[in-house]
């Protein structure tokens, strides 16, 4: 069976298209964050599969043509051409990706948001929807949901700034992260960005997944509290 060389340019074309699509999608799924999260992961999963398929066919082609060379030595030139063709395509795709990366890097710089995750000891404050809420004795204003163990941390500074209604809204927002397992999704997105660091668009995906998780948690909270109260609470965390 001959290696399907036509898959190499098709697969590489999809990898390039995915790299182009990524920055264009930024902010596109704000009204449908769940769909956005699924779409981002599907985009990079499909491009990853395409890249692996292209490499597999390229290696298969080399092995096949060397075997063919042993049987039909008179077709030496043709065999060499067929052996080199997939690798030339891979090299061309690499150049194209590097050019795209230069453009996407500008998007990363504009939209990159650093997220500091404090790992601090807290004191039990209350239980919310079966989840322990702990207060951390620092004056900075922050709140964060943790999965292991499952709990919500909130700073003393935040408790001082928030009204009772705003505190309730913050708890629903953080509980929304836990209910949808957003921490796991964000870790997966960061892992993809790390493994596919040569594709700058993966970093755009990581930041967009993080933003969409925040939007989804807001939507979850707004079904249970006054949206204006949630907006007021969020303003105190900026």
Give the ranges of each region predicted by the language model:
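Polar-ligand-bearing catalytic/cofactor-coordination segments
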Residues: 22-43, 97-186, 201-238
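Transmembrane alpha-helices and immediately adjacent membrane-cytoplasm interface residues
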Residues: 49-116
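Structural signal for membrane-spanning alpha-helices in multi-pass inner-membrane proteins
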Residues: 21-25, 54, 58-61, 194
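Alpha-helical transmembrane segments and adjacent TM-loop junctions that form the membrane-embedded core
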Residues: 76-85, 165, 181-184, 188-190
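Membrane-interface helix-boundary signature
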Residues: 5, 33-40, 78, 82-85
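Hydrophobic, aromatic-rich membrane-embedded alpha-helical segments
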Residues: 189-201
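Hydrophobic transmembrane alpha-helical segments in integral membrane proteins
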Residues: 1-17
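Cytosolic-side membrane-entry/anchor segment at the start of a transmembrane helix
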Residues: 42-50
């Amino acid at each position: 069976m001959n290696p399907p060389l036509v898959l190499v340019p098709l697969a590489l074309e999809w990898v390039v298209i995915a790299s182009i699509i990524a920055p264009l999608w930024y902010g596109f799924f704000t009204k449908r964050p769940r769909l956005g999260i699924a779409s981002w992961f599907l985009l990079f999963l499909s491009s990853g599969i395409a890249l692996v398929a292209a490499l597999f066919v390229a290696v298969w082609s080399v092995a096949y043509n060397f075997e063919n060379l042993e049987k039909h030595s008179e077709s030496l030139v043709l065999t060499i051409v067929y052996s080199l063709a997939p690798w030339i395509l891979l090299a061309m795709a690499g150049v194209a990706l590097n050019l795209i990366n230069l453009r996407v890097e500008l998007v990363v710089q504009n939209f990159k948001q650093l997220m500091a995750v404090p790992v601090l000891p807290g004191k039990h404050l209350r239980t919310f929807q079966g989840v322990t809420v702990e207060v951390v004795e620092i004056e900075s204003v922050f709140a964060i949901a943790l999965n292991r163990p499952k709990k919500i941390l909130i700073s003393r500074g935040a408790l001082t700034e928030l009204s009772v209604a705003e505190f309730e809204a913050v708890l629903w927002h953080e509980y929304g992260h836990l209910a949808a397992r957003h921490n796991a999704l964000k870790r997966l997105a960061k892992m993809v960005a790390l493994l596919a660091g040569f594709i700058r668009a993966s970093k755009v995906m990581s930041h967009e997944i993080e933003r969409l998780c925040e939007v989804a948690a807001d939507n979850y909270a707004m079904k249970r509290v006054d949206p204006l109260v949630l907006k007021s609470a969020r303003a105190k965390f900026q």
